[in-house]
Design a protein with these regions (language model features):
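Active-site neighborhood of HAD-like aspartate-dependent phosphohydrolases
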Residues: 1-57
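Substrate-recognition element of Asp-dependent hydrolases with the DxDx(T/V) motif
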Residues: 42-84, 95-104
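Ser/Thr-centric signal marking residues that sit
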Residues: 18, 62, 133
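Short, active-site-adjacent cap segments at secondary-structure transitions
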Residues: 18-20, 65-69, 106, 142-143
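Asp-based, Mg2+/Mn2+-dependent phosphohydrolase catalytic module
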Residues: 1-13, 75-97, 106-135, 139-182
Length: 182
């Protein structure tokens, strides 16, 4: 059973503390293989989802300013994000659906969450509009990015709770976990 409402065609995930968590103390994101593990419970929560052709489309939207600061390359960031998605969902998203901001935290760019740029890029890649898109994240910047992009938002903690209850809400639900106007 999918934990997502039936109107969803595209699920965009944040990466850190949503799909994966860092295993290196005092490091906010992984810089290489072996420095992360799947977020506990997320793999099980997504086990009933069919991804790819005939199923849901997937994207990733992640702030990766560690590229700007020289801690990892853009290629490594892309690989680690795709590896995390595959480890958690069993499906490797197409590279064009994996979007990240490599700018400095204070760059003021249009892509760094809470700006909506990364979400819009993932939707454009898949040809899916905001009304059929859900963004799953863990932070207030994720919620704000979803609102600014006009897409529904689901907190990862609510995803885990929903997966246990197996009762997806309807579109326009008053539930705080999936709401167009959060």
């Amino acid at each position: 059973v999918s934990p997502f409402p039936p109107w969803v065609r595209l699920v965009i995930f944040d990466a850190d503390n949503t799909l994966r968590r860092v295993t290196v103390p005092d490091q906010p994101c992984p810089h290489g293989p072996g420095e992360w593990e799947p977020m506990p419970g997320v793999r099980d929560a997504l086990a009933g989802v069919r991804w790819g052709p005939g199923g849901l489309l997937m994207g990733i939207a992640s702030n990766q300013d560690h590229i700007f600061y020289g801690h990892l390359s853009a290629e490594m960031a892309q690989r680690l994000l795709m590896d995390a998605a595959e480890a958690v969902t069993g499906h490797r998203p197409p590279p064009g659906a994996v979007r990240f901001c490599a700018h400095a935290m204070d760059a003021g760019c249009a892509c760094r969450k809470p700006a909506p740029g990364l979400l819009r890029e993932a939707m454009d890649f898949h040809g899916v509009g905001p009304a059929a898109t859900l963004f799953v994240g863990d932070a207030e910047v994720d919620r704000k990015a979803a609102r600014r992009a006009g897409v529904a938002f689901l907190h990862v903690a609510d995803l885990l709770a929903r997966a246990q209850s197996t009762m997806p809400p309807s579109r326009g639900s008053e539930s705080p976990s999936v709401n167009q106007k959060t």
